């Protein structure tokens, strides 16, 4: 069985306050208000039952659970854990289910202390039968901070008290001061209330302040800074500019992609490129301007501008110095410069090789290739020592 401890602390005036706050510790096992004793509540015999809060018309109505409706369960000859443990196991001192704290509705207007006490007597008199007997059953009252009185009645009468119109709660009372066995409130002795002293509510005020502090801490949102940081990050993601990303696919292409880039100057010891390379974009004139040309008799690359783009000048090797009288490579129209194949330039510290792939030079004399056509005289269009004997090649 669960044991619940609540505090006896009901809010002070004004009278139209929405709720009463208890800081007076007591157990809760009163019957359901404004309803007949039901079999469900009669069978639920907890040691200290919880009370539930239900808002009605802006007011808090707390209802405790009831124990046996006909006889006190403390007097059960066969107590067991299915109904309620014996009295020796009760944890709250003073909670004997004979002392009851009766909480009533706040009085209307600004009644005096005596008028408030008189209303308590009349309320209890509806149950015990007379005001005189009611006076003798009351052991404490509260006319400040909260409105309640303590009544020494049986558990059966506590059920009837709950059915009254002006009664909010009827709860088992317990000691507020265990050492002095004091239930708290303003003592009511022999049918009379002692003069009021603020000390009677000092303990309640302290307990009420502690309860308010606990409520304030519980109501404060947790992880406040973390929540603000999360909101700030979400706003940045929603409205801020997209983050800068590096370009996809790697670095940008080099400036001369798609064409033949000139080699770096003096790379590998070669001569620098001609000064006017790439300035004249027109193709160079063909070697034989006066008539048709024929392909060379060997597998050398085609002549300049012959049916397609000009191949590299040094295609697989080093050509002779004056390649058929063709213009030098300074007006190549974007073609790669000399020595693109890695071969040595003309007269690179040595004489070019005597034979170009084992075939005679391409542009020495075209007397045998033309058909009666006047060919220009290329007296000096052969490499020196072409045949190895020191004489020019004779066709």
From Swiss-Prot:
Compositional bias of kind Basic and acidic residues: 211-236
Query: Which Gene Ontology biological process is one annotated for this entry?
Result: mitochondrial mRNA modification
**Mostly located where?**
mitochondrion
Q: What's a Gene Ontology MF term here?
A: protein dimerization activity
* Gene Ontology, cellular component aspect: chloroplast; cytosol; mitochondrion
InterPro entries reported for this sequence: MORF/ORRM1/DAG-like (IPR039206), MORF/ORRM1/DAG-like_MORF (IPR054059)
Q: Where is the composition biased (Pro residues)?
A: 240-300, 335-355
Residue spans of biased composition, Low complexity class: 313-334, 356-385
Give the record's keywords alphabetically: Chloroplast, Mitochondrion, mRNA processing, Plastid, Transit peptide
Pfam families per UniProt: MORF_dom
Q: Where is the transit peptide?
A: 1-56
Q: Where in the cell is it found?
A: Mitochondrion; Plastid, Chloroplast
Quaternary structure, per UniProt, is:
Interacts with protoporphyrinogen oxidase 1 PPOX1. Interacts with PCMP-H52/MEF10. Homodimer and heterodimers with MORF1/RIP8, MORF2/RIP2, MORF3/RIP3, MORF4/RIP4, MORF5/RIP5, MORF6/RIP6 and MORF7/RIP7. Interacts with RBG3/ORRM3. Interacts with PCMP-A2/PMD1. Interacts with ORRM1 and VAT3/OZ1. Interacts with PCMP-H13/MEF35. Interacts with RBG5/ORRM4. Interacts with ORRM6.
Its job? Involved in organellar RNA editing. Required for the processing of numerous RNA editing sites in mitochondria and plastids. Binds to the plastid RARE1 factor, a pentatricopeptide repeat-containing protein involved in RNA editing.
What is this protein's record name?
Answer: Multiple organellar RNA editing factor 8, chloroplastic/mitochondrial
């Amino acid at each position: 069985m669960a044991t619940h401890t609540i505090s006896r602390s009901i809010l002070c005036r004004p009278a139209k306050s929405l709720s009463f706050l208890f800081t007076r510790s007591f157990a809760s096992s009163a019957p359901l208000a404004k309803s007949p004793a039901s079999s469900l509540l009669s069978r639920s015999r907890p040691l200290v039952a919880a009370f539930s809060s239900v808002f009605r018309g802006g007011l808090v109505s707390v209802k405790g659970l009831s124990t046996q409706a006909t006889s006190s369960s403390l007097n059960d000859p066969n107590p067991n854990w299915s109904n309620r443990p014996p009295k020796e196991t009760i944890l709250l001192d003073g909670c004997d289910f004979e002392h009851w704290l009766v909480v009533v509705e706040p009085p209307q207007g600004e009644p005096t202390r005596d008028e408030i006490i008189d209303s308590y007597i009349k309320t209890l008199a509806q149950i015990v039968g007379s005001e005189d007997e009611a006076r003798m059953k009351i052991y404490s009252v509260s006319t400040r901070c909260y409105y309640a009185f303590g009544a020494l009645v049986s558990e059966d009468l506590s059920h009837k008290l709950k059915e009254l119109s002006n009664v909010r709660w009827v709860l088992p009372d317990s000691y507020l001061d265990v050492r002095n066995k004091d239930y708290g409130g303003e003592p009511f002795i022999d049918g009379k209330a002692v003069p009021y002293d603020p000390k009677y509510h000092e303990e309640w005020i302290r307990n009420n302040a502690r309860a308010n502090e606990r409520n304030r801490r519980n109501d404060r949102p947790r992880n406040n800074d973390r929540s603000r940081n999360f909101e700030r990050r979400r706003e940045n993601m929603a409205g801020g500019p997209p983050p800068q990303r590096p370009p996809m696919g790697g670095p940008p292409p080099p400036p001369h992609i798609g064409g033949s880039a000139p080699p770096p100057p003096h790379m590998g010891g070669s001569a620098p490129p001609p000064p006017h390379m790439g300035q004249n974009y027109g193709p160079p004139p063909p070697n034989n301007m006066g008539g048709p040309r024929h392909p060379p008799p060997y597998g050398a690359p085609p002549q300049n501008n012959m049916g397609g783009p000009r191949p590299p000048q040094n295609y697989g090797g080093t050509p002779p110095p004056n390649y058929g009288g063709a213009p030098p490579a300074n007006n190549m129209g974007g073609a790669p410069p000399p020595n693109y194949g890695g071969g040595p330039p003309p007269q690179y510290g040595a004489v070019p090789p005597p034979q170009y792939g084992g075939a005679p030079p391409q542009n020495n004399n075209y007397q045998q290739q033309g058909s009666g056509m006047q060919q220009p005289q290329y007296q000096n269009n052969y490499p020196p020592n072409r045949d190895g004997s020191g004489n020019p090649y004779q066709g």
